[in-house]
Amino acid sequence: IPRPIQVRNGDMLRLAPGDPGIIDQVPHGRIFKDGRIIGTEDAVGVKDRRRLSFAGHVAVNVVLDDRYQIDGDPDIVAIGLPKADQRGENIEELMLDAAIGAIESIPRVRRKDLDLVSESVRRAVRSAANEAWGKKPIVTVFVT
């Protein structure tokens, strides 16, 4: 090869006529076909499904009254998580306690920020699952 050219993923190389050179950029990487959709890993949801298959999903519904107090226990639905940890404790109960503790640790005045409440509960539930099981599930929190 009289004149080597260094190319990277996505570079379009012209070899002839004339001197070789990079002439354009093209899409590169993995492309997935999922059902009738073709796209990147993120576009077709493959990345999230991999995470779901590895660590499961937890949905938490929190209802606050007009004074921003907890109105009953939060509802928790766990999919793909074990029922109990190695000590035999119910993981959903551990996550419920963590959710309630997270809400109660926020001063009532700051509970008006529902995004703050949601993120606090999400982190607490995810942490409780990780302590009990060793994996961090995807956690979705609904606060009303």
Label each region the model flagged.
Residues 1-144:
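Acidic/His-rich, metal-assisted hydrolase cores and their charged scaffolds
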